[in-house]
Structure formats: structure tokens, C-alpha cells
Amino acid sequence: MKKKTKKLLIAGGVLLLAACICVPHICSVQIRWDGITRIQSMNIPAKLPKGAAAVKEKISPLLGGTVMGFALAGILIGVILFLKKTARAIHRKLRILAVLSSFFSMPLHELMHAWACPAGSEVHLGIVPEKLVGYAVTNAPMNLAQFTAYMAVPAVAIGILPLIGALCLRKHHRNQAQFMFIYGMFGLVQTAPDWFGLIPVLRQAPADAVVQISNGITYWFTR
């Protein structure tokens, strides 16, 4: 009982610390709720300086769609669990819970995009039912570090960190480790379009570049 109480206190302390860090910054961002809308609402125009260069992006049509991405992750995880003997120990309901938890963490995914935006940025949040996706779009200019945070924070939080947690728990807390592994795998697939948007920018834009999104296209320029 004492161990459970200690764990709950630690978890509560971590959540409180996270709230103290995240809440003040998210309040400094101007959030505009677009509601349930169409894919075109994600295309917000911005005033670009002359000479701004469009980033050449190559997005995989397979991973670019959330439904297909989740299907691919399901197949991959199924193969891994089939080959892994320890997979027999995890209850089927726990697997389903992990998948659903990842799917319903999409709003958190978009809020983390908004949190990573520079203070004072206007961020549009919405849901596109036809694609089964949400979005958090800003046309605020960002330096390369800010843009990297904007694109990568969700993948770290709901993909990489759960996988690290699974590795740490695998010996003594097998069920929790399996849950975090499945959640993290789906989290990485869910954030795959972010990586496809970030990597071309890092390859094409110089270190002192300013990055700005306009009408769904990413541009970079120097001042």
C-alpha cells in the first residue's frame, strides 16, 4: 500500500510540474477554434517576404493518411507481438486499451503543437472528419529551433518517451511495458506526417533561416 501511495505521489508531482511548465506558455498563444471543418481550412495565408523559397516536401501517401498509418502500425505490432513470446502474458483488453488511448490522444497531439509555438502566435485548431485528423496550424514566422520544436514535440511526448518507458519497465512490469510499447508505436505513426514535414526543412533551410507556413506550404527565408 505504501509503495502504491508513493508511486501516486510521484506521478502527481510529475503532472503538477508539467502543468506549471506548460499552462503559462499555452496561455500566451492565441488559439482559434475552427471546429469541425474541411481540409481546406488548414490552408491559412501568410504575408511572405520576397525571395521566400518553398520547401520541397515528399510525403509518403501511405503514412500521410491517418487511417492507413494506423493500419500499418497495427500490422507491424501484430507481427512483433506474434514473434515475441512474452506477448502471451498481456491481456487482449490491455492491447485494445493501448490502441484506443493512442487514437484518442490526437487532441493532446494538436495541443502540443500549439504549446510549442512561439508566444503570441495565432494557432488554428480544428477537426477534419473526412481524414480522421485534427490540426494545429500557425502562420507565425519561426526560427529553425522553434519550427523543430513545433513539429517534433508531439512525437517525442506520445511516441519516443513511451517507448523509452517500455524499455525501462520490461523486466519487472511486463504488462505496463507492453501497453507503453503499443501506445508509443502508434504515437510514432500518428506523428509520421510531422516528421515528413520537418526533415525536408532541416535539409534545405540554412541554420539562420526563418520558416513560415502559408496556405499549407512551408517556406523559408533569411533576414
Where are these regions (language model features)?
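Membrane-interface helix-boundary motifs at transmembrane edges
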Residues: 85-93, 170-174
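Final/C-terminal transmembrane alpha-helix of multipass membrane proteins
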Residues: 16-20
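Active-site recognition of the HExxH zinc-binding catalytic motif
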Residues: 105-118, 154
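Short pre-active-site segment immediately N-terminal to the catalytic Zn-binding motif
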Residues: 90-107
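Membrane-helix interface/capping segments
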Residues: 86-90, 114-128
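Active-site-flanking alpha-helical
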Residues: 112-120, 161, 201
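Positively charged n-region of N-terminal signal peptides that target proteins for export
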Residues: 1-6
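Metalloprotease/metallohydrolase-associated module, dominated by Zn2+-dependent proteases
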Residues: 7, 11, 21-80, 129-223
